[in-house]
Amino acid sequence: MTENNNNNNNNNNNNNNNNNNNNNNNNNNNNNNNNNNNINNNNNSNNQIQQPQLQVNEGINPKPLVIGLNKSFQVNGENNTTSINNNNNNNNNNNNNNSSSNIPAPSNTFTFKAGIPSSGRQRTLSPLGSKNVTFSTNVENQSTTTKIDETINNNNNIYSNSNNNNNSNNSTNSNNSNNNDDNNGRTENIENNTIQDSNSNSNSNDNENNRSNSFNTTVNGNNVNSNHINNNNNHNNNNNNNNNNNNNNNIVYNIQKQSFNKLNGSGSSEIFQFDEECEEELEEQQKQNENKTGSSAEEQQQQQQKQKQQQQQQEDVDDEDDQIITVEGGNRSRSNGLMQELKLGTSLPVGIPSRLSQSLQTPSQIQQQKKQEQQLASSIFTSNINPSTQTNNNNNNNNSNYSNRNISSTTYNERKKYVTPRDSWVDILKEKEEMESSFEISQSLKRKQSYKSYI
């Protein structure tokens, strides 16, 4: 009996020692996890300067927002069925390689209810009120990817010096103790120093950018780095950046177009309908230039001249259409007045002698008038004559004009027009009044003529 009791005590002591060892192992693991968390926190503080995507600063892990979804609808990552609340509880115990980079991990995304303001609820209680959301318009460049690679290499060196600890993504949870349950409810066995996780060691790509994150695996106590995947995917990242830029430009153009249509009130895509003809002409010219790139400059000039001639012909046709429309055999215009064919450029103050003055003049007077006009023209426009002779001729002409009273008063008035137009117009109006008064028909004669016309 005493031997059995001693054996039992020894077994109990051994079990206690084993438990103590396990506890020590767990404590060591917790210490290592805490160290890793501190390292990750430092990396996060360094890498928060450049944020290539929309991120939410929530704890350690930056995760994208999905706006407009309820909590009941949960978006899960690949090969992972854990809920959001469990992930929130397990974030403190998990080691995160992706925290060193600004690229969000392909883990679960946070969802929340849309904040709809009501009468009893303030607008400041929206979901975005308690979270710091940063928006970046620019897409990350190659410089950011190189910095990310450098930080990943530094972190890998730190992890390799930490007694071959297990490093995994947010979706993997591993413990060194045998048959210990994780917070996620998953068990993991260690056989021959190899880790058998439910999730694969390779990281799943992001939602749309096809980026691969660096990861560490422990095989027989040795750390294996996979940073070469990031180097291979730099080209893909550049292509995705170009596609993102094109998409952003298209989105901005569509927004501007919609806002302009709203301001215009039409809402149609064809804003300027009157410019369609001009656009067609421009397209035709571009096609002609493309088809005739090898043609000579002379042919192009000839084509341009032909186009100008055609345009002028069209303009002439339009001008003819815009002319006065005649009615009733061409005798009347739109104003119902008699058409008067007056050439442009004719000025009204030109001295036109009345028919009465012309009829009263004798042939001798007309000849004398012509001679005087010729003398005036010769004295003004000839340069061979001395100035003294010119003045003498002018004086003689003036004296002859004033002395010869046989010439009718119309010639005097016509010459006077070029000096004082107002007096000339007054004289012309007086002559017209005299003519009208002399040729007036009495009312009795007018009545007789009108009576005869009716008969």
UniProtKB/Swiss-Prot annotation:
Compositional bias ranges of the Polar residues kind: 119-146
Taxonomic superkingdom: Eukaryota
Compositional bias per record (Low complexity), positions renumbered to this chain: 1-47, 79-103, 151-182, 192-250, 298-314
Segments for region (Disordered): 1-48, 77-250, 276-338, 383-407
Protein's name in the database: Putative uncharacterized protein DDB_G0274535
Organism expressing this protein natively: Dictyostelium discoideum (Social amoeba)
